[in-house]
Amino acid sequence: DELKAMGVETVVSVWPTIDEKSVNFGEMAERGLLVTADRGNAIVMTWMGNTFFFDATNPEAQAFVWEQCKKNYYQYGIRCFWLDESEPEYGPYDFDNYRYYAGPALQCTNTYPVGYAKCFFDGLREAGETEILSLVRCAWAGSQKYAVLTWSGDISSTFRAMREQLQAGLSMGMAGIPWWTSDIGGFLGGQVDDPAFRELLVRWFQWGCFCPVFRMHGERSPWYEREQEYIGDVRQLTSGQGNEVWSFGDEVYEILRKYLFVRERMRPY
């Protein structure tokens, strides 16, 4: 309520993964709500634990995941969700081994982000929401129907990557997805005190000011040392440098500040 009074809408990041230690894992596995493997172990990611993907092509799995988010977030006022990891990002990429409710992964994996977005769109609509928008890391044919705001994912902090975003944004618009953005400054490889990166950030920020969505997001180095490598048996993340507009020196800040106010003047339109 305090944030909303300030004009700020909180967005909660949701991953489509479930740890084998989760209280929900047993039920989801027994009911066939997870992506499975035709051979070997179905663990598809070991980042922050041994995790499995929920099967976004399965209507029952969609309903189950939404019910958890409704109970833990929606009922407390959250109305917008950030659907990360929506490719999904397998490790390893053995697409001939994974199987969905909709069929073998080789036939239907690209539809995963469509089902992921539909899960939240249908849930929010059934809850009575009429203005729905979900931030999603990728999209596919059909995503247009489910109120997606797509961004281009974990891209490099290079001028080449910035140039590629112009192409990507034009393609998304022609595909019927008007809400699109990229991580201003790129996501990977930006060093806060590197003059070359600061130049890239300024140019990207100037362009980003006129994109459909204006968003800074990314890992900024150098990284801090971990206080603990593991807690229990889960490897801990560390934190990078600040990514606020004032994190890159006074000269850069004055330029970014200028374009922040340009964007604010444009916002009513």
Model-predicted segments: where are they?
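Catalytic-domain carbohydrate-binding cleft regions of carbohydrate-active enzymes
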Residues: D1-Y269
